[in-house]
Design a protein with these regions (language model features):
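Extracytoplasmic
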Residues: 1-123
Length: 123
C-alpha cells in the first residue's frame, strides 16, 4: 500500500505501525494504482490482501497489461482482520513498466475494503 497512488475523494493511505493500507474507501469511484517495473515477462499469479467488515458481495477488478481479473469480496468480519484471496493469473507480455489498477465495480454496504496489497508471484 505504501507505494500506491490513490485517486478519488475519500480513499487514502493509512500508515499505522505494521499495518499500512488504503482505507476510508467509501466512494466506489475511487481507485488505486501502482507503477511497477517487471523484470521478466511471463505468467504471474495475482493475490489481493484486504479486510472488509461489511457484507459480502462487493465486486472489484484488477487490471494490468490490458487484462482484467474480476474479484468478489467476502467479509472478513473486521477492518483489522485481513485475508489473502487468490484472484487469477495475468500474462505480462514484456519486461518493463506496467500499471496495476484496482477499481470497485459494485459496492455493497458502506465501504469497499481496506486494501493492504496486490501480490504478483511468477509462475
Amino acid at each position: 500500500a505504501l507505494d500506491a497512488t490513490v485517486h478519488g475523494t475519500k480513499a487514502k493511505l493509512e500508515t499505522h505501525p505494521g499495518n499500512h493500507r488504503i482505507g476510508f474507501w467509501v466512494n466506489a469511484a475511487d481507485f488505486v494504482q501502482w507503477k511497477f517495473n517487471f523484470p521478466r515477462a511471463g505468467n504471474y499469479d495475482v493475490e489481493l490482501t484486504y479486510s472488509a467488515a461489511g457484507p459480502s458481495g462487493t465486486k472489484a477488478v484488477i487490471t494490468l497489461a490490458g487484462q482484467s481479473l474480476p474479484v468478489t469480496l467476502k467479509t472478513t468480519g473486521s477492518w483489522y482482520r485481513y485475508t489473502t484471496l487468490p484472484v487469477g493469473r495475468i500474462k505480462i507480455p514484456k519486461t518493463g513498466p506496467h500499471v496495476i489498477t484496482v477499481k470497485c465495480t459494485k459496492k455493497i454496504g458502506g465501504a469497499v475494503m481496506n486494501l493492504k496489497a496486490v501480490t504478483l508471484r511468477p509462475r
